[in-house]
Amino acid sequence: FKAQVRLSEEYGLPLIIHCVKAMDELLAVKKEFRPQQAWVWHGFRGKPEQAMQLLKKGFYLSFGEYYPDETMQTVPDERLFLETDNSSLDIEDILCRAAKVRGVEVEALRETIRRNIQNVFFRA
């Protein structure tokens, strides 16, 4: 994993992270490297408290089909991504559910996600 962190930094690319039951180790690596590139937690399903801990450390959180509603509600717009990964759902279905959970219009959330993609993956 540390080699991937080095590559992310060397090439100026965000790091997409699949982490299961290793949050403390992940946070230790982040503290060790103090990366300049964005770290995106793929398929986040944790509790709001875990989300807040990660957000304070600068993570972006990406949500798929399964997540606690309260967690989705705690993530600020500028740190949010949506994904389908291995889901049978279309991204539009995930977008609609997330908008409902967050209490926003679908188009507003679509624009938020588009802006985040632009800022993280296509910044100059």
What are the language-model segments listed below?
Residues 19, 43, 59, 65-67, ...:
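Active-site metal-binding loops of divalent metal-dependent hydrolases
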Residues 26-28, 51, 72, 90-96:
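Histidine/acidic-residue-rich catalytic or RNA/ligand-binding cores of hydrolases
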Residues 34-35, 76-78:
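Acidic, glycine-centered active-site loop in nucleotide-sugar glycosyltransferases
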Residues 6-11, 95-124:
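Mid-to-C-terminal alpha-helical segments outside catalytic/metal-binding sites
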Residues 78-90:
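Short acidic/histidine-rich active-site segments
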Residues 69-77:
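Short amphipathic alpha-helices and their capping/turn segments at secondary-structure boundaries
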Residues 1-57, 103-104:
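Divalent metal-binding pocket/active-site signature
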Residues 22-23, 69, 114:
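Positions that flank functional sites
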